[in-house]
Amino acid sequence: MAYQKLSPVTLIAAVQDKVEALTELRCYDHVPLNEASPLYFAEITRIQPANSKTMYRDVYSVAIHCIAEESPSSVGVYNLIENLQSALSEDITLPEPFELVMQTDNGVQTIKTDESGEKHAIVSYDFTVCYGFICKL
């Protein structure tokens, strides 16, 4: 029997839903041209199998970009990071039959100033998802 893996679209939608609900800011998968900041932008950077003895699992690595309003100060981007980490301290919600096994904050990967003068941070998360159980007969 073949198991269906979680669609990357479904995972990103679950991340966006949680971030938007708890930060009250938009979380895009593609930022429209000239979109006003502050905002979040989420993208999957890696999908890796992580099967155990009893479960079929994949680890989805997601980079969430925190883009603050233009300012010489970093306070705006720090607030975005703090709000994101607070929002994702709650587990994302996945549809049946998928089960979120683990949601890991891998921390801030980089903070930089874009050409536009906006502060831009990248926060990395891993989502371990079970999509079936291994049964030995």
Predicted features by range, described:
Residues N34-S37, G117:
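Short acidic/glycine-enriched loop/turn segments that link adjacent beta-strands
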Residues S37-R46:
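A short, hydrophobic beta-strand-centered structural micro-motif
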Residues M1-H30, R46-L137:
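Charged, amphipathic alpha-helical segments and their flanking helix caps
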